[in-house]
Amino acid sequence: MDEYKKAEILIEALPYICKFHDQKFVIKYGGHAMVNEQAKNWIAKDMVLLKYVGINPIIVHGGGPEINRAMEKMGKVPEFIHGLRVTDEETLEIVKMVLIGKINGDIVSKLEQYGGKSVGLSGKSGQLIKARKKIQYLIRDNEKIEVDLGMVGEVERVDTKLVDILVEKKYIPVISPIGVDEQNKDLNLNADIAAGDIAGAMNAEKLIMVTDVDGIMDDINDPKTLHRKLTISQIEKMIEKGIITGGMIPKIEACINALNKGVQSVHIVNGKIPHAVLLEIFTEEGIGTMILKD
């Protein structure tokens, strides 16, 4: 690439840097980008660059594949209902060990390797996420039945004071999705849903979902069917038609929840693409799917 082209790329980002200066972006970090070393580097560099150009990234991470591996090593079989992990006491201890004990620290170390200042938290830190036990329902034979997911929670409220202080002090917060209930008992939270609630509570400009797919497509096997921009009503029609199914539905519900709580836009990008977050934010066309309110 010649030097002029490099300059043009930098200049293309300028209006977006100006527009989003001092804004908060919540990044839900999951999927392949968490287990591939090169992808980890791309994400870490993207986050540090955002911070240095005046944007405030707040990371909420998952860890499904690593939790599954840890469970299998201990002779437990992972079980999911509607994309949510069934969590007994032993599973919860494994989840906390992997999320708080390993993944969170690894992300913090990677950010600091590239010049960022970062602090690892969980929803327990500073009473960040108060949660309640989630009640899940299934439809069987046209009958609505309640299913016990175990120690799985849903966000009741988010206290942003601690995260606000860290952002103001130029740190990149990294949050594990573990909440506490009114009895101070730990609950496992779906990371997508927690990220949406945190984004809403933080008055974030954007929620960016780093996933294993390019975005929302009519045909998952045909990249040409990728939608660059969708509204909530268009998304809801795609769910009705069965285009969006399975584990993608909790992600979409989290996206819609964030938009309804005041987040201006939600983006779904593929963490397997080098610097996908920067390409989505700082280029006209973007690289994934942007979702907006109607």
Curated annotation (Swiss-Prot):
A single GO molecular function term of this UniProt record:
ATP binding
One Pfam family linked to the record: AA_kinase
Q: List residue numbers at the site (Transition state stabilizer).
A: 28, 251
Task: Name it.
Answer: Acetylglutamate kinase
Q: What does this protein do?
A: Catalyzes the ATP-dependent phosphorylation of N-acetyl-L-glutamate.
- Enumerate the NCBIfam families for this protein: argB (TIGR00761)
Main location, first listed in the record: cytoplasm
This entry carries the following GO cellular component terms, namely: cytoplasm
What metabolic or biological pathway is this protein involved in? Answer: Amino-acid biosynthesis; L-arginine biosynthesis; N(2)-acetyl-L-ornithine from L-glutamate: step 2/4
* Chain sites annotated for binding substrate: 63-64, 85, 188
Q: Which GO terms describe its biological process?
A: arginine biosynthetic process via ornithine; L-arginine biosynthetic process
Q: From the Swiss-Prot or TrEMBL record, state where the protein is found.
A: Cytoplasm
Q: Tell me the InterPro entries matching this sequence.
A: AceGlu_kinase-like_sf (IPR036393), AcgluKinase_fam (IPR004662), ArgB (IPR037528), Asp/Glu/Uridylate_kinase (IPR001048), Glu/AcGlu_kinase (IPR001057), NAGK-C (IPR041727)
Q: Which reaction does it catalyse?
A: N-acetyl-L-glutamate + ATP = N-acetyl-L-glutamyl 5-phosphate + ADP
Documented EC number(s): 2.7.2.8
Q: Which UniProt keywords apply?
A: Amino-acid biosynthesis, Arginine biosynthesis, ATP-binding, Cytoplasm, Kinase, Nucleotide-binding, Transferase
The record's section on Gene3D superfamilies has: Acetylglutamate kinase-like
Q: Superkingdom, according to UniProt?
A: Archaea
Family of the protein in this entry: Belongs to the acetylglutamate kinase family. ArgB subfamily.
